Amino acid sequence: MTTTTDSVLRAGVAKHGDELRLTLDPRFQGLPGTAHGGSVLAAFQAVAGIAGRQEVRGVYRKRVPLGTPLRLTVAPRNGGLACRLFDEADTVLVEGGVNPVAKAPTSAMAPGATGDPLPVSSTCFACGLDNRLGLQAQLLFDEASVWGRWAPRETAAAADGTLAPIALTALLDEAAFWLGALASGESGMTTELAVTLHRSIAFGAPIIVAGARSQTRARADDDRFWETNVTASDVSGHLVASGRITFVAVRGAARRLVTGLLALNAPSVLRRIFPAYTR
């Protein structure tokens, strides 16, 4: 029997008195030692149990550790659920929630025709080549966009025969990270995520994820923060999910990231994204 992302995610949620504890499996890694942003959103969505079109939000205050039971509080709010995730010192790591959305879908962004591969890693949940639970997605980029066509792996099936929502939240978060990195020339993290799940899609259908580089803009009051817009659609262009995700550039963080990525990626690719950190 295949171990799935959905089953592993749900197994990490446990009752603890009147509260919950969330333990994110190490295979849900994003940057080394840190949970992928899409995994926390998916945990909020799983706990909420809301059907239909919905928005899942998360504001990340600090990096989220893996393999550690974290206190998760939930409370009804505006027909949905408010969620807050705390570390062992009772510091807020992520706050957000899930709410039904009535607004009609917007159109999906068009993918590029060709492009150069974005870097991949060994262990990342979204792109890690050796992460057997992960998506193993390969995104591309050109002067206009970040995009990719992803064929779901059997680990991404939900129990009801649809694509697990964590695949969509992670793909959108991954695309937003690279849009921010390309715009800033720096590594960093996604810090404010709002993903709308417009509809479910049968497991096995390919997903097109895309984001326009021209729509990636620095905040006027703080140019470390970059606002991105990303979409996920089926091959016919019908929207499945969309996201408004903020990337924060952390000056100098790319130095360590590039060092690790050089084992699997050509210097010429890394140089185009992180020119100040790649020889």
Residue ranges, per PLM feature:
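Hydrophobic beta-sheet segments that form the core/acyl-binding groove
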Residues: 54-92, 195-239
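Short histidine-centered catalytic/ligand-binding loop motif
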Residues: 27-34, 153-167
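Mixed-charge, glycine-accented linear interaction segment located at domain edges/termini
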Residues: 233, 239-246, 254-256, 260, ...
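A generic structural signal for short beta-strands and their flanking turns/coil linkers
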Residues: 18, 52-54, 68, 144, ...
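Active-site helix/loop of acyl-thioester processing domains in fatty-acid/polyketide metabolism
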Residues: 34-53, 163-188
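Non-catalytic linker/capping segments at the edges of enzyme domains
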Residues: 1-22, 78-80, 87-91, 97-158, ...
